[in-house]
Amino acid sequence: MKYTISYKYPHKHFIDIDLLIEDIHQETVQLQLPAWRPGRYELSNFAKNIQRFEVFNEKGQSLKFKKISRERWEIESQGNTKITVKYNYYAAQMDAGGCWLDENQVYINFIGCMMYVPGREYEACTVKMEVPKDYQIACGLPKKGNTLMASDFYHLADSPLIASPSLIHKSYKTDKNQFTIWIQGEVNPDWQMILADFKKFTEEQIKVFGEFPEEDYHFLYQILPY
């Protein structure tokens, strides 16, 4: 799965998402938008934020589709082995599981806005972020330039992102792991105290559990004025 995220009018809160699907060998392709998110055991209605949905082949010709449930679409491939799905997502929910877009930042929980092909969840995913040059990108996924790489859809779903020109960050290390603290918002942090406290609880948790599963881990914080 190859995703591209862009936007034209950030004050309107609409994110443009393109999804390139390759190696299609069926007459129809289904796309699913999740109705769940990590750490929350209840159904969500992320599909209400989909404002536009279009499908094209490599020649730019429109393909037929229909919505078969609240979170699922079915596309007629018409013999095409490669298609591009384009849709808008309304990103105006600033909380631990939402997405937000304005003139100052892009905040994304991929689980709420990224569609996938059922049965192909374990394929590698890339996400190209088309953001201004002065934006930093905070995310736990490995990246090359502005392209993020996930081993599969579940890896992507577990990796929230903030992109902004005003992000600040500091890093610290344990014996085998590196940790980065990212902060978005108007704040003047006491980095010396924060790094000391984070390192203490990190080392204690690793001691208790015996290991930490990630070599590189990122904490993301939104400091809000309300």
Where are these regions (language model features)?
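Catalytic zinc-binding patch centered on the HExxH motif and its immediate surroundings
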Residues: 225-226
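Non-catalytic architectural context of zinc metalloproteases
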Residues: 45-51, 56, 61-201, 207-215
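N-terminal, polar/Ser/Thr-rich
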Residues: 1-10
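Surface-exposed beta-strand/loop patches in extracellular or lumenal glycoproteins
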Residues: 15, 20-47, 115-132
